[in-house]
């Protein structure tokens, strides 16, 4: 019996009488095959391969030699078509193969694209382990983010600047109130009145209010012990009763001055004083003001329930107390506001990232050696639910979020274990190979066994490689990481980079494979890239292999290690 492994505990088995499907070592379904079909499939499985497909003529000759039978006219093509149909019928409800049971390279020959040994077992176990660990990715990404010291440094700076701004605004508001306060005007008018008497020229007394703000009226007991009321409209003598009524009016704030043997009482209408002060009071800064006069009156403006911030006392007995709106709460709210303003793009990108990884998973894509028919390692590819993955990754790079995702991938593939089950490569942007980013990345890897880990340096045309990056790549090699250059032949990933990094692998971009069969220039370019990799003793990997024709053509050019949809990891 010949077995063709399709994936995890699933294979197609060929016997002389039937072709069957086994799942978990249990027969699931079987379809009879003819002797011709058995002879053809077993011959191709024995003698054909991707690197050396077997032609129809050779197959027919082998069948004649080993089975002592000759195929009828068109018998070969009919048998191949029947076998493909039976294979699809067996597997359609269990796997979605991108390959037929028999693949044909035009004018070259036939081969079986499935191995007769189970090469995926460890890779599938590793994939299952990763799938378990990629659950709750949002919470894990937040945890990684909160351990980033740079965040707390930024917050500390914003808090310091916000605190300085907060108290500066409070001082400015207080100074503005003091500058426009009625006390200075009241003192000026009191000083002027004390030098005159109630019998002075009335127009002159009334004119004292022309350049005075807020002061509504004044009561004077002059040096001749004459009591009078002075207003912008009139000067009239008053009785003691009228004086008391004038002084005790709760709608006014009154201050007394004893100057030049005269007693001057100046009063301001509370509503005018309030309107003048309220323009300097706000919810987040100066919340209120309370003033006391030497006549025993006091007046509150705004909210005076909080903690006082500043007060001043005049020699005249006048006192002002200023209150602020919960400084801690205000500073925190203002800091959050400034953080949103300053980092709104990064915050928006991070929120978008968190939404994208709600259904995030990592797919292991095999890197297959066609000569040994073994997977040499697997690339961990991130899969997001976004419209444009490339643009999404570029957004992460531009907003400094790629490090968080790279650490998330590292933790997912290790799945809380010290080592990997199979060799795995992860993509690392050059921006993570310098400065604080590299320090964090290195610290994450240093605590793990990296002998099966490959760091795949992606192409970034906007970034130049520096001596710092070369030195840091050398540090990764000391951790036993292998190094791979992705997208070789494009952008900055060129020959100069190979000579300085000495990578283990060179990955040729899929753009060189698309349309390869009909483009002689691409064939020649690819041949030169492969030769260049061999010159620098690098293992060359070709990406984007999606068809049997492309896979075989690459082997004729000397590229035997492939990656692409033609080599899926089936469960």
From Swiss-Prot:
Gene3D superfamilies: EAL domain. Keywords: c-di-GMP, Cell inner membrane, Cell membrane, Hydrolase, Membrane, Transmembrane, Transmembrane helix. Overexpression of the gene results in 52% and 60% decrease in c-di-GMP levels compared to the wild-type strain in cells grown to the exponential and stationary phases, respectively. Overexpression promotes swarming motility and expression of the swarming gene lafA, but it inhibits biofilm formation and expression of the biofilm gene cpsA. The chain crosses the membrane at residues 155-175, 321-341, 395-415. Contains a putative N-terminal DNA-binding domain, followed by a degenerated GGDEF-like domain and a conserved C-terminal EAL domain. PROSITE patterns: EAL. It comes from Vibrio parahaemolyticus serotype O3:K6 (strain RIMD 2210633). It is a multi-pass membrane protein. Residues 344-571 form the EAL domain. This is Cyclic di-GMP phosphodiesterase TpdA. PANTHER family: CYCLIC DI-GMP PHOSPHODIESTERASE PDEF, SIGNALING PROTEIN YKOW. It comes from the Bacteria.
């Amino acid at each position: 019996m010949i077995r063709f492994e399709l994936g995890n505990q699933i294979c197609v088995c060929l016997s002389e009488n039937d072709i069957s499907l086994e799942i978990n070592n249990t027969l699931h379904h079987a379809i009879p095959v003819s002797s011709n079909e058995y002879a053809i499939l077993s011959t191709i499985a024995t003698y054909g391969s991707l690197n050396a497909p077997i032609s129809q003529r050779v197959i027919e000759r082998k069948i004649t030699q080993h089975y002592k039978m000759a195929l009828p006219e068109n018998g070969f093509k009919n048998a191949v078509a029947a076998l493909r149909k039976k294979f699809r019928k067996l597997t359609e409800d269990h796997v979605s193969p991108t390959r037929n049971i028999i693949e044909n390279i035009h004018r070259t020959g036939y081969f079986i694209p499935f191995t007769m040994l189970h090469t995926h077992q460890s890779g599938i176990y590793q994939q299952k382990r990763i799938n378990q660990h990629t659950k709750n990715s949002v919470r894990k990404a937040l945890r990684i983010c909160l351990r980033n010291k740079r965040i707390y440094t930024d917050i500390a700076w914003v808090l310091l600047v916000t605190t300085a701004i907060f108290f500066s605004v409070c001082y400015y508001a207080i100074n503005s109130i003091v500058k426009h306060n009625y006390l200075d005007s009241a003192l000026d008018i009191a000083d002027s009145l004390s030098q005159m008497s109630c019998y002075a020229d009335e127009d002159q007394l009334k004119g004292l209010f022309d350049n005075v703000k807020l002061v509504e009226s004044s009561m004077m007991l002059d040096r001749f012990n004459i009591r009078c009321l002075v207003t912008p409209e009139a000067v009239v003598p008053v009785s003691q009763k009228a004086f008391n009524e004038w002084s005790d009016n709760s709608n006014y704030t009154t201050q007394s001055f004893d100057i030049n043997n005269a007693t001057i009482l100046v009063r301001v209408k509370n509503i005018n004083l309030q309107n003048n002060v309220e323009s300097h009071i706000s919810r987040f800064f100066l919340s209120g003001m309370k003033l006391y006069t030497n006549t025993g009156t006091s007046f509150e403006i705004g909210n005076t329930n909080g903690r006082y911030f500043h007060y001043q006392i005049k020699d005249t007995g006048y006192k002002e107390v200023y209150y602020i709106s919960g400084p801690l709460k205000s500073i925190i709210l203002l800091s959050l506001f400034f953080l949103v303003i300053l980092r709104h793009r990064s915050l928006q990108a991070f929120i978008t990232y968190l939404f994208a990884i709600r259904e995030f998973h990592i797919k292991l894509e095999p890197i297959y050696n066609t000569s040994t028919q073994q997977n040499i390692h697997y690339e961990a590819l991130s899969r997001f639910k976004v419209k444009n993955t490339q643009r999404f990754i570029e957004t992460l790079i531009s907003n400094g979020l790629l490090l968080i995702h790279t650490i998330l991938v590292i933790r997912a593939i290790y799945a809380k274990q010290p080592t990997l089950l199979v060799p795995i490569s992860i993509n690392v942007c050059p921006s993570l190979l310098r400065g604080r980013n590299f320090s964090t990345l290195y610290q994450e890897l240093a605590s793990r066994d990296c002998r099966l880990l490959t760091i795949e340096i992606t192409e970034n045309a906007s970034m130049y490689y520096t001596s710092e990056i070369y030195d840091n790549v050398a540090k990764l090699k000391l951790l036993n990481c292998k190094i791979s250059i992705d997208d070789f032949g494009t952008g900055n990933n060129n020959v100069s980079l190979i000579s300085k990094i000495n990578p283990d692998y060179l990955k040729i971009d899929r753009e060189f494979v698309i349309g390869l069969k009909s483009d002689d220039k691409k064939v020649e370019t690819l041949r030169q890239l492969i030769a260049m990799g061999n010159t620098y003793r690098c293992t060359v990997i070709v990406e984007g292999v999606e068809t049997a024709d492309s896979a075989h053509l690459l082997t004729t050019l000397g590229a035997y290690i492939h990656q692409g949809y033609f080599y899926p990891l089936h469960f």
